[in-house]
């Protein structure tokens, strides 16, 4: 029996048995959520272990954490702001697109516009002229003045009262205004107000008198020009206006405001400018004149240049007391001299003398022609009077100033009148 069963067992085919062998420590497969939590906890434990190894106090770690949080918040804020800015740009683009989009109404109005342009062409108007019309003129301020006539003495009385809203021509945002008053067409007698420093609303309250017969007054024009004073360069004109005398009713006193207008270009030929200094020592009775330089002199020679030199006359009551002159500078319109001349003038006489400065062009063959002339001292006006007054107010100190040369005949006429 045993042998038979043994033979059957050997003859039968082997039975394959599949057995699943699990490791001893294996558990059931975990869900995805539980796996993530385990991974996070492991990372946390690892991070905390590394953190404990850093040799820093707790407060430092807290500060680092706060800074990190602030950096993250700042980055988020910047990103949000950039996104909002892009949205706004898109909206603007849409609005522009809407404005630029062709409207059927605009197309219908196109014919009318073309018709209007044709009408303008017939009337001679151009687009440039149409654009210039709405432009406002530059505001130069205004001036209040008064006019009256003294029939008994044949005198025109001009009052310069005040100015307002003048433009600022100086660096500090102000101006140093004064007013010139003269009659056209002669322009021989000019008056100037005092300079008011650093103001755009000066109050003058000055009156000037012109000796003019009433029969001749109708053919004259009164000019009032406001200037900005500058010691070391040419004075800038702010604005002016003209009053034809034949339009004024002299039956009563005229007092009114007038807006200043842009000044017309000077028709008179420019003769140039000269710079000289004045110094007076009262105790010694010594007046020193230093001729420094001249510029932009009138061309007197054929070659377009000049040979300028300067004469200085000390005068009193129309008489020449002393005469000096500089060296001649050849072939130049901008000569530099820096030559000093002294005059003895007692203190009691300094208010009565005049210093007349004349620039001449030297000529070997003919007469030396005068280029221009200016005088300071007794009865001088404007910039010349201010220069003289500054010298007297600052004894022993040289005071330099530029002066505009005037026509010789006009200066001689002023010297003759003001004896």
UniProtKB/Swiss-Prot annotation:
Keywords attached to this entry: Calcium, Cytoplasm, Cytoplasmic vesicle, Differentiation, Glycoprotein, Lipoprotein, Membrane, Metal-binding, Palmitate, Phosphoprotein, Repeat, Synapse, Transmembrane, Transmembrane helix
PTM note: Glycosylated.
Cellular location(s): Cytoplasmic vesicle, Secretory vesicle membrane; Cytoplasmic vesicle, Secretory vesicle, Synaptic vesicle membrane; Cytoplasmic vesicle, Secretory vesicle, Chromaffin granule membrane; Cytoplasm
Any GO MF annotation of the entry: calcium ion sensor activity
Cofactor annotation: Ca(2+)
Phosphothreonine modification, residue list: 126
Sequence ranges assigned to domain C2 in this UniProt record: 139-258, 270-403
Transmembrane segments: 58-80
GO biological process, one term: positive regulation of dendrite extension
Keyword Transit peptide: no
Glycosylation-annotated residues: 25
Binding site for Ca(2+) 3: 230, 233-234, 236
Region (Phospholipid binding): 133-379
Comp. bias regions, Acidic residues: 117-131
UniProt modified residues of type Phosphotyrosine: 227
Residues annotated for Ca(2+) 1 binding in this entry: 170, 176, 228-230
Cofactor note as given: Binds 3 Ca(2+) ions per subunit. The ions are bound to the C2 domains.
Membrane topology: Single-pass membrane protein
The protein's role, per its UniProt record: Calcium sensor that participates in triggering neurotransmitter release at the synapse. May have a regulatory role in the membrane interactions during trafficking of synaptic vesicles at the active zone of the synapse. It binds acidic phospholipids with a specificity that requires the presence of both an acidic head group and a diacyl backbone. A Ca(2+)-dependent interaction between synaptotagmin and putative receptors for activated protein kinase C has also been reported. It can bind to at least three additional proteins in a Ca(2+)-independent manner; these are neurexins, syntaxin and AP2.
Domains as described in the record: The first C2 domain mediates Ca(2+)-dependent phospholipid binding.
Protein name: Synaptotagmin-1
Species annotation: Macaca fascicularis
Gene: SYT1
């Amino acid at each position: 029996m045993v042998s038979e069963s043994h033979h059957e067992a050997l003859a039968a085919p082997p039975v394959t048995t599949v057995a699943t062998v699990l490791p001893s420590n294996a558990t059931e497969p975990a869900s995805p959520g539980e796996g993530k939590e385990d991974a996070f906890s492991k990372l946390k434990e690892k991070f905390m272990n590394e953190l404990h190894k850093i040799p820093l106090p707790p407060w430092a770690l807290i500060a680092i954490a706060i800074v990190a949080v602030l950096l993250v918040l700042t980055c988020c804020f910047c990103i949000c702001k950039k996104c909002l800015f892009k949205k706004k740009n898109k909206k603007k683009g849409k609005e522009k697109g809407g404005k630029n989009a062709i409207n059927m109404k605009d197309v219908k109005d196109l014919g009318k516009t073309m018709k209007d342009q044709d009408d303008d062409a017939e009337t001679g108007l151009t687009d440039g002229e149409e654009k210039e019309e709405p432009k406002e003129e530059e505001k130069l301020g205004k001036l209040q003045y008064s006019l009256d006539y003294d029939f008994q003495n044949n005198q025109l009385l001009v009052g310069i009262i005040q100015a307002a809203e003048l433009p600022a021509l100086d660096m500090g945002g102000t101006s140093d205004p004064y007013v010139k008053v003269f009659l056209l067409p002669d322009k021989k007698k000019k008056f100037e107000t005092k300079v008011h420093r650093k103001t755009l609303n000066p109050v003058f309250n000055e009156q000037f008198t012109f000796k003019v017969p009433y029969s001749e007054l109708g053919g004259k024009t009164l000019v009032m020009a406001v200037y900005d004073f500058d010691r070391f360069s040419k004075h800038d004109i702010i604005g002016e206006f003209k009053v034809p005398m034949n339009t004024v009713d002299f039956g009563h006193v005229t007092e009114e405001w007038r807006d200043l207008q842009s000044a017309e270009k000077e028709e008179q030929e420019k003769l140039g400018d000269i710079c000289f200094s004045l110094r007076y020592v009262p105790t010694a009775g010594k007046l020193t004149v230093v001729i420094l330089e001249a510029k932009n002199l009138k061309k007197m020679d054929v070659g377009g240049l000049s040979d300028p030199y300067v004469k200085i006359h000390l005068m009193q009551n129309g008489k020449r007391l002393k005469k000096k002159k500089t060296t001649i500078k050849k072939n130049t319109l901008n000569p530099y001299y820096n030559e000093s001349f002294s005059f003895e003038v007692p203190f009691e006489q300094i208010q009565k003398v005049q210093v007349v400065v004349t620039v001449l062009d030297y000529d070997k063959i003919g007469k030396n022609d005068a280029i221009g002339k200016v005088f300071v001292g007794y009865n001088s006006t404007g910039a010349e009077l201010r220069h003289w007054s500054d010298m007297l107010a600052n004894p022993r100190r040289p005071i330099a100033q530029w002066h505009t040369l005037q026509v010789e005949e006009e200066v001689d006429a002023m010297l003759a009148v003001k004896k």
